[in-house]
């Protein structure tokens, strides 16, 4: 289902989401960068609304790749949750040509998110010899799409047989929708198994937990962005989790956007942060299952917020948790954590981890 964001709702949404995965410390640089990002997002949404209309604002997110081109008149939207690819244009002249070009580029784009600006209309998508969507989409003959010739033929088929149109009240929107293969999630996950195993061995974090976090955070979308400016497969925030990891590794500053958009670096950083939560921030919790529940919840909402569910005193909170069964800890975190998002997050990650453990 498309995510429609009205400009009037952008600012409060940005503010309410800005604390996610921040932990418990704030710094001036983070606030300054976040305010700048909020302004950028507001301007970006305003540009889209002016062209597409109030109810047609679609912006990239953790599980949605959205790229605008043609002076914001054409967009490609990959919904990694639903497994759909929608190419749309409101171009007044030769809309089919605009759609055809966008279809081909989307099908053949690579997997280097650092080279693509999702917050502009710059046409910076390059055709790759190893398309990111290869194997996740098949053409009308049931074949995967690697080369431009096959992508072009499929685009022509789509325009002839699946072209749709609707009105936004002022202009006509032309679109085609492509369904991804049923196991598209597994296809994407497979791309990163080697990186996950390497990070798992390096930091002592279970592979199934890393995969479950990736699925929940981004649905294995390497282009993942968020309103809190979390980046990449594991949705790492530069100035919070990223900075903590760098400091623990003896590095100064914060990881760059290009660093966090690199899949291997993102997985390494996200896994390192999971290890920090487990071995440093929440090490007072004795039972490994109880601690895992706390770590999962803390990855979303911070370690401090997890402990405060049980007591405002961190040591006392750990002591209370240690008197409880893992089931009681899970029940408490999924019902009493102040953040509804964090309550749901523990359920989602725990469920996903069970599925990866069975494989």
Curated annotation (Swiss-Prot):
Signal peptide annotation: 1-16
InterPro entries with a match to the protein in the record: Lysozyme-like_dom_sf, Murein_transglycosylaseC, Murein_transglycosylaseC_N, Transglyc_AS, Transglycosylase_SLT_dom_1
Lipidated sites in chain (N-palmitoyl cysteine): 17
Gene Ontology MF term list: hydrolase activity, acting on glycosyl bonds; peptidoglycan lytic transglycosylase activity
Pfam families in the record: Mltc_N, SLT
Signal in keyword set: yes
EC id: 4.2.2.n1
Catalytic activity field: Exolytic cleavage of the (1->4)-beta-glycosidic linkage between N-acetylmuramic acid (MurNAc) and N-acetylglucosamine (GlcNAc) residues in peptidoglycan, from either the reducing or the non-reducing ends of the peptidoglycan chains, with concomitant formation of a 1,6-anhydrobond in the MurNAc residue
Gene Ontology BP annotations: cell wall macromolecule catabolic process; cell wall organization; peptidoglycan metabolic process
Cellular location(s): Cell outer membrane
Single GO cellular component term: cell outer membrane
Lipid-linked residues (S-diacylglycerol cysteine): 17
Predominant location category: membrane
Membrane topology of this protein: Lipid-anchor
Family listed: Belongs to the transglycosylase Slt family.
Functional description taken from the UniProt entry: Murein-degrading enzyme. May play a role in recycling of muropeptides during cell elongation and/or cell division.
Protein name in the entry: Membrane-bound lytic murein transglycosylase C
Organism, scientific name: Shigella sonnei (strain Ss046)
């Amino acid at each position: 289902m498309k995510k429609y964001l009205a400009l009037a709702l952008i600012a409060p949404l940005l503010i309410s989401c800005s604390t996610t995965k921040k932990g418990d410390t704030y710094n001036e640089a983070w606030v300054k960068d976040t305010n700048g990002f909020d302004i950028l997002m507001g301007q970006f949404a305003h540009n889209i609304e002016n062209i597409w209309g109030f109810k047609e604002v679609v912006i990239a997110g953790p599980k949605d790749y959205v790229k605008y081109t043609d002076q914001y008149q054409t967009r490609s939207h990959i919904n990694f949750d639903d497994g759909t690819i929608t190419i749309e244009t409101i171009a007044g002249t030769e809309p089919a040509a605009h759609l055809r070009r966008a279809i081909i580029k989307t099908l053949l784009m690579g997997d280097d998110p650092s080279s693509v600006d999702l917050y502009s209309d710059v046409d910076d998508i390059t055709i790759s010899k190893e398309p990111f969507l290869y194997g996740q989409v098949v053409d009308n003959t049931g074949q995967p799409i690697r080369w431009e010739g096959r992508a072009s033929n499929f685009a022509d088929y789509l325009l002839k047989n699946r072209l749709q149109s609707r009105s936004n009240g002022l202009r006509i929107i032309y679109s085609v929708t492509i369904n991804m293969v049923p196991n598209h999630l597994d296809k994407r996950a497979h791309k990163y198994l080697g990186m996950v195993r390497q990070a798992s061995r390096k930091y002592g974090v279970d592979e199934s937990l890393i995969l479950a976090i990736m699925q929940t955070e981004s649905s294995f979308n390497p282009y993942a962005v968020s309103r809190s400016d979390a980046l990449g497969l594991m949705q790492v925030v530069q100035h919070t989790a990223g900075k903590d990891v760098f400091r623990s590794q003896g590095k100064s500053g914060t990881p760059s956007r290009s660093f966090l958009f690199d899949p291997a670096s993102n997985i390494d950083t996200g896994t390192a942060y999971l290890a920090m939560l487990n071995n440093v921030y929440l090490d007072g919790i004795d039972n490994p299952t109880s601690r895992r529940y706390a770590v999962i919840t803390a990855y979303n909402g911070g370690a401090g917020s997890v402990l405060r569910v049980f007591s405002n005193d961190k040591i006392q909170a750990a002591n209370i948790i240690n008197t409880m069964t893992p089931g009681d800890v899970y029940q408490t975190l999924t019902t009493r954590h102040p953040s509804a998002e964090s309550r749901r997050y523990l359920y989602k990650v725990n469920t996903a981890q069970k599925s990866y453990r069975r494989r």
